[in-house]
Amino acid sequence: MKRARFVATFVAAALGVAAMVGFVWHAGPVHIAEVLVRMRWAVVVATLFEGMRVVSETWGARALYGPEVPRRALVRAQLAGYALCYVLPAGRAVAEACKAAMLSPHLPRARVVGVALASQAMALVAVGVASSLCLVVARGSLSGPLATALAAHSAVTLGAGLLLLVTAARRMPPTGKGIVLLAMLGSRAAQGAAVFVLLRAAAPHANMLDGLTVWGLHLMGASVGDLALAQVGFTDGALLLGAAAAHLDAASALSVALAVRVAQMAWVGVGLAAGASTEGRLPCAVHRRVGMGVE
């Protein structure tokens, strides 16, 4: 099982990198660089929106963990989880396992595992809701295979989240799940705002429908590329495939995808530093310590 997972991860990463090289060559590296320079201040704003995502999800986690967990420990765990979520394959599940491992000294093992399950379920539901919103509002822009793919993505993520809520309900904390859902929806709203700011900087003619189209494609690409490191090549490919639907040229579409990744990587650096400050390293052996199985 571990070998198969390693092979799948390696293949996904290799395909993603190869695809990314092809995308940049197709769009023109000089043109992409020009667009990114024009977007530099928008990247700063997008980074702030990413910080709002961290704050929102930390607020939701606080509702589940309760006052027994020290605030500093919770913030460190959330930052470390954010970093793992965006750089490792199956990032969200690994992030929840990491947070559970880091916070297990403060709460019983069953409690932290239950919180991780609830967070994972609500994250899936929030992605499903956000994708459905993009699909419904921007359905005039999307058509054919792209619309079908986004509809399937919305149904799968929403269904998976609800199924996890039902099947693991007994292991989850009895209270706080509503606040977590609000926090996850707020996190996705901040992500959507970041995407729109970047889109407007790359293409000043873009409107709200174009923004929802790009956001929906980004969500879908991130899920499809869940096995790849940092979803390289997958979010970029999704935006490139939907560039015409969002009235973008190839360079602008790729620039938005790259700028989103830059904003995320800024917080990944903060998260890695926060995780390393606990034990001198991130608790990577979370599966041995907590026994998570939420992928």
What residue spans do the PLM features occupy?
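Membrane-interface helix-loop-helix junctions at boundaries between adjacent transmembrane segments
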Residues: 100-122
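Predominantly cytoplasmic-facing regulatory/coupling regions of multi-pass membrane proteins
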Residues: 1-80, 108, 127-227, 234-237, ...
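Generic hydrophobic/packing signal
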Residues: 68, 87-91, 101-107, 129
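Hydrophobic alpha-helical membrane segments of integral membrane proteins
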Residues: 114, 231-232
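Hydrophobic transmembrane alpha-helix segments characteristic of membrane transport
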Residues: 62-63, 99-101
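Structural signature of transmembrane alpha-helices in multi-pass secondary transporters
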Residues: 82-85, 119-123, 260
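Transmembrane helix boundary and interhelical loop/hinge segments in multi-pass membrane proteins
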Residues: 93-99, 234-239
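Short intracellular "coupling" helices and adjacent cytoplasmic loop segments at the cytosolic face
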Residues: 79-97
